UniProtKB/Swiss-Prot annotation:
It comes from Clostridium botulinum C phage. One of its GO terms (cellular component) is extracellular region. Residues 1-6 form a propeptide. Residues 204-372 are annotated as: HA-55 domain 1. This is Hemagglutinin components HA-70 type C. Residues 460-462, 513-514, 522-525 are annotated as: Sugar binding. The lineage of its organism: Viruses, Duplodnaviria, Heunggongvirae, Uroviricota, Caudoviricetes. This protein can also be encoded on a prophage. Its main location: secreted.
Length: 623
């Protein structure tokens, strides 16, 4: 049953009536800590004898979290509710979440203690301003928490309880006046969900990863601006302890969701990808609890504000250095407590415009990036662990679409993985969480893990390359094969390397095959992350006679790097590397070096600066 009070409430009280605002209607937050007159807000008192500790408190539930409306002729209850919830807080949703609070205090050794408990409220107003004067005001009180007044007394002493029975509403904390002008051309409606479309800037931090879907954990402790997530404020008097406790029950909290493309990145699709990446417990599956306890010192009062918080996740579609689509998912977390000296109720009230809608992060900053397999792409399995030398024929039935091949190796070691004619290029990932989970007669145990960690590989379909990677027999791996023509017979070729070419792990080796002319040759490839490697294999044009040579120089552009030039040789144990030269500064390097015609070299680059999505490698051949 609604307990809303509908009565005209004009400017009869001692309210702020002169404002420095333009003509129009405004929604205003007047602050927390309001005690109401003429309402049954007194919850009762508690008496403790000398030396005893008393505890008083209350559990605010939906049935007791009743807002009080004071509409006017122009501003009815619906108008008040919609505008307040649009700007400041969804108090209808907040009332679904139970919240408890309590106070405790010990009586002195020579006196008894009387503690009297009251509800407190957050006050909102809708005002009409004309010529800097408030000509009409509607008021809404939304339940906050409570306040306890402690009085020490001697036996048979009369207690002055006038404090509790006030003739007008009053704020025991500092009043506020946070305002926003109401645009009457916009019809404000209460949102029944938190889905919003967002625009975003694609010029964000470059990710050193291939194209695909990524889920990013951006950390915990997010709160909405304008105190939209405020649970309530306790005024705790000196020598008193106060606490706020919230049991977070199933289905009483809802995520906040924004998307740039509701057709592709819907909330349901985003939640499925978050579950793929982090196996998170979504909002309707968990029951949690948090509690904050604070004690005021003997010489001053304090206030304790408690907020609901969120953990932020992002789902992005990353393509060629840009974010094509993005969704933001704010998962209800627990809470945050802010403690400060109690403000003076006599402090001046300052007119303050609302902050821009958004989020602030108060918790630890995170940027944990996990790739997820696009559900539109096929997954094939090599069910038996691959031996040291193995060839896998890619089924023709899947060659018209990109696909993943799930596998594990029989022996831990460094492997060269390539395709027939070194095309198309490959990308290899580790299946996150696949290590030491289970054993199935040494066969592949598919735990249906869709979370992947990028190791190395390239996006470009025209980039001849192969992979040198360290693989462990207790882990599962995915190789992504880009779309290839069904008329092309393609194979995955695995070989465990015993030579020191293993020094190149974990990197992609790009094959350069157009060095027949003199001049500058650019090779733009996706840049790995800082501290990781990318390699280039080149065979010097001409016949090998161990005498004739050509002059080259090697450099990077945009990205700083450290380089090592190797001569590649082959022996009975496999491929070996002979170090020819080391480069400590590759950015715009012009140092020449003489290389044997007909010989094969590998130039390995360690990225030390990520300035561009691509690394530009320049092999310059002198005439």
């Amino acid at each position: 049953m609604s307990l809303s009070i509908k009565e005209l409430y004009y400017t009869k009280d001692k309210s702020i009536n002169n404002v420095n605002l333009a003509d129009g209607n405004y929604v205003v937050n007047r602050g927390d800590g309001w005690i109401l007159s003429r309402q049954n807000q007194n919850l009762g008192g508690n008496i403790s004898n000398n030396g005893c500790t008393a505890i008083v408190g209350d559990l605010r539930i939906r049935e007791t979290a009743t807002p009080y409306y004071y509409p006017t002729a122009s501003f009815n209850e619906e108008y008040i509710k919609n505008n307040v919830q649009n700007v400041f807080a969804n108090f209808t949703e907040a009332s679904e979440i139970p919240i408890g609070f309590e106070f405790s205090k010990t009586a002195p050794s020579n006196k008894s203690l009387y503690m009297y408990l009251q509800y407190t409220y957050i006050r909102y107003e809708i005002i009409k301003v004309l010529q800097n004067t408030v000509t009409e005001r509607a008021v809404l009180y939304v339940p906050s928490l409570g306040y306890v007044k402690s009085i020490e007394f001697n036996s048979e002493e009369q207690i002055d309880k006038n404090f509790y029975f006030t003739s007008q509403d009053k704020c025991i904390l500092n009043e506020k006046f946070i305002y926003k002008k109401i645009d009457d051309t916009i019809t404000v409606k209460e949102s029944k969900n938190s889905n919003n479309n967002i625009n975003f800037n694609t010029s964000q931090t470059i990710l050193p990863y291939p194209n695909g879907l990524y889920v990013i954990n951006k950390g915990d402790g997010y709160m909405r601006t304008n105190d939209k997530d405020l649970i309530g404020t306790l005024l705790i008097e000196s020598s008193t302890s106060g606490s706020i406790i919230q049991p977070r029950l199933r289905n009483t909290t809802r995520p906040l969701f924004n998307t740039s493309n509701p057709t592709i990145f819907s909330q349901e699709y985003t939640e499925a990808r978050l579950n793929d990446a982090f196996n998170i417990q979504l909002f309707n599956t968990s029951t949690t609890l948090f509690k904050f306890v604070e004690e005021a010192p003997t010489n001053k009062n304090i206030s304790m504000k408690v907020y609901n918080t969120y953990e932020k996740y992002e789902l992005i579609n990353y393509q060629n250095g840009n974010i094509d689509d993005k969704a933001e998912y704010y998962l209800p977390s627990l809470g945050k407590c802010e403690v400060s000296d109690a403000p003076s109720p006599q402090a001046p009230v300052v007119e303050t415009p609302v902050d821009q809608d958004g989020f602030i992060q108060t918790g630890p900053n995170e940027n944990i990036i996990v790739g997820v397999i696009n559900p539109s792409e096929n997954i094939e399995e090599i069910s038996t662990p691959i031996p040291d030398d193995y060839t896998y024929n890619i089924p023709t039935s899947i060659q018209n679409n990109a696909c993943y091949v799930l596998f594990k190796v029989n022996t831990t070691g460094v492997y060269k993985i390539t395709t027939k004619n070194n095309l198309p290029p490959l990308i290899i990932y580790e299946a996150i969480g696949s290590s030491n989970r289970n054993m199935n007669s040494n066969n592949l145990s598919n735990d249906n893990i869709k979370a992947i960690k990028y190791i190395t590989g390239l996006n470009r379909s025209d980039a001849k390359s192969y992979l040198i990677v360290s693989l462990f027999k207790d882990k599962n791996y995915y190789i992504r094969i880009p779309q290839i023509s069904s008329s092309t017979t393609s194979q995955l070729i695995f070989k465990r390397e015993l030579g020191n070419i293993s020094d190149l792990a974990d990197s992609t080796v790009n094959i350069l095959d157009n060095l027949n002319t003199s001049g500058t040759h650019y090779y733009t490839r996706q840049s790995p992350d800082v501290g990781n490697y990318i390699s280039y294999q080149l065979t010097i044009p001409g016949d090998f006679n161990n005498i004739a040579s050509s002059i080259f120089s090697f450099r990077t552009r945009n990205n700083q790097g450290i380089g090592t030039l190797y001569r590649l040789t082959e022996s009975i144990n496999g491929y070996n590397l002979i170090t020819i030269n080391n480069y400590s500064d590759l950015l715009n390097n012009v140092e020449p070096i003489s290389l044997l015609n007909g010989a094969t070299y590998i130039f390995r680059v360690k990225v030390t600066e990520l300035n561009n999505y691509n690394i530009i490698f320049d092999a310059y051949r002198n005439s």
